[in-house]
């Protein structure tokens, strides 16, 4: 039975960059655990701020954090008060100087994590899983997606036997490395247990098509 490789991990170093941009030898484990603490803290603190990606860079005793969000106003706060409080709390958490950069997500309907979160929250609010997926697909295609695929797994409608059901529209070329495919998975806590939500969104090609540079042809 064929299994799918993680679409983002497969493209790292080709069209995707790392979310953690630092190098360490002896301090590797320490920095890795610190990254996990930072990500967990931000995800909890900004749970309602539509946060997608958190990028972490390190230089000497300084940590630069880029937060990609669809609601920058909620993260920044009035006069920058919220982001300043967040910076102070992260300074305390890490013991290092923290700089926070807020990046606005212009089209949240093309971000797999935010789409997945939206479907998961709807499932928790007892919206039918087929309806939640189809609405998300329609919004993504209207926003300019070339293709989208969704899948919900678990005890659908409270069935005794867990199963998976998914929908797709357009094309999602998982094997094409130059294809900009965003992928995310989320969990929905329902009265019947957890449901898993997976989302793949194809946003178009990034690298230009390869030119024919062959020499000495006919």
From Swiss-Prot:
PROSITE patterns noted in UniProt: KH_TYPE_2 (PS50823), RIBOSOMAL_S3 (PS00548)
InterPro entries: KH_dom, KH_dom-like_a/b, KH_dom_type_2, KH_sf_prok-type, Ribosomal_S3_C_sf, Ribosomal_uS3_bac-typ, Ribosomal_uS3_C, Ribosomal_uS3_CS
Residue ranges of domain KH type-2 in the record: 38-106
UniProt entry keywords in alphabetical sequence: Ribonucleoprotein, Ribosomal protein, RNA-binding, rRNA-binding
Any GO BP annotation: translation
GO molecular function: mRNA binding; rRNA binding; structural constituent of ribosome
Gene Ontology CC terms: cytosolic small ribosomal subunit
Gene3D superfamilies the UniProt entry points to: 3.30.300.20, Ribosomal protein S3, C-terminal domain (3.30.1140.32)
HAMAP family attached to this UniProt entry: Ribosomal_uS3_B
PANTHER family reported in the protein's UniProt record: 30S/40S RIBOSOMAL PROTEIN S3 (PTHR11760), SMALL RIBOSOMAL SUBUNIT PROTEIN US3C (PTHR11760:SF19)
Function summary: Binds the lower part of the 30S subunit head. Binds mRNA in the 70S ribosome, positioning it for translation.
Subunit structure: Part of the 30S ribosomal subunit. Forms a tight complex with proteins S10 and S14.
Family in the record: Belongs to the universal ribosomal protein uS3 family.
Name of the protein described by the UniProt record: Small ribosomal subunit protein uS3
Organism listed in the record: Enterococcus faecalis (strain ATCC 700802 / V583)
């Amino acid at each position: 039975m064929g299994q799918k490789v993680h679409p983002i991990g497969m493209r790292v170093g080709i069209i995707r960059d790392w979310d953690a941009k630092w190098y360490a030898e002896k301090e590797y484990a320490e920095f890795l655990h610190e990254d996990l603490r930072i990500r967990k803290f931000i995800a909890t603190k900004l749970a309602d701020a539509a946060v997608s990606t958190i990028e972490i860079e390190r230089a000497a005793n300084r940590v630069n954090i880029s937060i990609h969000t669809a609601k920058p106003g909620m993260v920044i706060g009035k006069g920058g008060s919220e982001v300043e409080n967040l910076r102070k709390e992260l300074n305390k958490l890490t013991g290092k100087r923290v700089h926070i950069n807020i990046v606005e997500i212009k089209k949240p309907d093309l971000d797999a994590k935010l789409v997945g979160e939206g479907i998961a929250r709807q499932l928790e609010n007892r919206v039918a899983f087929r309806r939640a997926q189809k609405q998300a697909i329609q919004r993504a295609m209207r926003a300019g997606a070339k293709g989208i695929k969704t899948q919900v797994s678990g005890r659908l409608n409270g069935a005794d036997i867990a199963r998976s059901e998914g929908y797709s529209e357009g094309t999602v070329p998982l094997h094409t490395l130059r294809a900009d495919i965003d992928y995310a998975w989320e969990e929905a806590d329902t009265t019947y247990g957890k449901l898993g939500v997976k989302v793949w969104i194809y946003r178009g090609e990034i690298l230009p098509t390869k030119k024919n540079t062959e020499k000495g042809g006919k």
